[in-house]
């Protein structure tokens, strides 16, 4: 009979403990074996047995993972499977739950690929910070590939169609086999050292993991990472990945896409050039228009500030002053002309118009502003002296000082002497503010 102090387990508890031990004690494992008892129910899950000559293990691959298998699982097929050990508690079945499975021919290569990829990742060879940007305009391109493969035909066809001016050097190489990796590495290093190329393209068409294995070589990966020239990798189809893709500066899913990435479409380029030319013409016209407007404004300012312009302005002012002065003088002369013949003769002899003409002629001969200003001041002083002289001889000025001009009303003749009048004669005396009629009472000479 069992010791009451010992723990008594139920089947569920025991299976749960066993499951925990299996899942905790075994990490992710790889198993290479032969498929047997393959079934796929309506759920889409895949159930089978992996076996060798002496043992077997039940396996399950659930629908989200089995959908992505690249082959059709069948009886007797040798595979490489990856999964975790577990226990199906309801029946106590020990089994392997898989998340990846491939045909066994690629199994060893896949493990080597994963190990090398993890090591190079840890070294930072795949870091985005170390990758170089492609130049905006590629002028010389080196293409490392098989000269007889479909990849080179696709690349050259796209390049010729999109940008025929590109200079392309084909560096022929093996792209699969034992010596392919060394040959590709050597060509890459020589092309990079030459400094001739803007970009180096490494490419080939699709194939199995074994066919593409040259592009998973560690020496090639390190050569790509060390290259000073930007490197583009386009190996296989879109779903294929190689170490050269991860370490290259740019990865293209196919050779054709790589060619499209490297060069612009010449039709698009021509359109861009035309748009740029139109924009440049527009900017030039705008700049020219602005420059002409600025030039016109400067020319106007220069003309306005030039000595000649200043002289013309002063000349116009002088002419205006002369016209005003002449108008005033003519008004006075017109009133006195009929009455004072001699005064009119004196006024005509001192007519300011002749003096103004002389002054204007001298002003036009003066260009520098300072000299013109001095001459203008001198002429203004002279005009004032002439005006004072005219006022001194003007009959009106004499009358304004308290004198009178005496004339005969009958004929307007001026009485110049007391001897010319007789007692009782009626005369007219012209005063400053009007005239009066007078009669001679007596006279003395």
Curated annotation (Swiss-Prot):
Keywords annotated in UniProt: Cytoplasm, Exonuclease, Hydrolase, Nuclease
Described purpose of this protein according to its UniProt entry: Bidirectionally degrades single-stranded DNA into large acid-insoluble oligonucleotides, which are then degraded further into small acid-soluble oligonucleotides.
GO biological process: DNA catabolic process
Keyword Iron on entry: no
Enzyme type, top EC level: hydrolase
GO MF annotations in UniProt: exodeoxyribonuclease VII activity; nucleic acid binding
One GO CC term, this protein: exodeoxyribonuclease VII complex
CDD domains recorded: ExoVII_LU_OBF (cd04489)
Protein name as it appears in the record: Exodeoxyribonuclease 7 large subunit
Top-level taxon of the source organism: Bacteria
The organism's taxonomic lineage, starting at the top: Bacteria, Pseudomonadati, Pseudomonadota, Gammaproteobacteria, Lysobacterales
Assembly behavior: Heterooligomer composed of large and small subunits.
Source organism of this protein record: Xanthomonas axonopodis pv. citri (strain 306)
Family: Belongs to the XseA family.
InterPro entries according to UniProt: Exonuc_VII_L, Exonuc_VII_lsu_C, OB-fold_nuc-bd_dom
NCBIfam families: xseA
Primary location: cytoplasm
EC number: 3.1.11.6
Reaction(s) catalysed (UniProt annotation): Exonucleolytic cleavage in either 5'- to 3'- or 3'- to 5'-direction to yield nucleoside 5'-phosphates
One Pfam family this sequence matches: tRNA_anti_2
Subcellular location: Cytoplasm
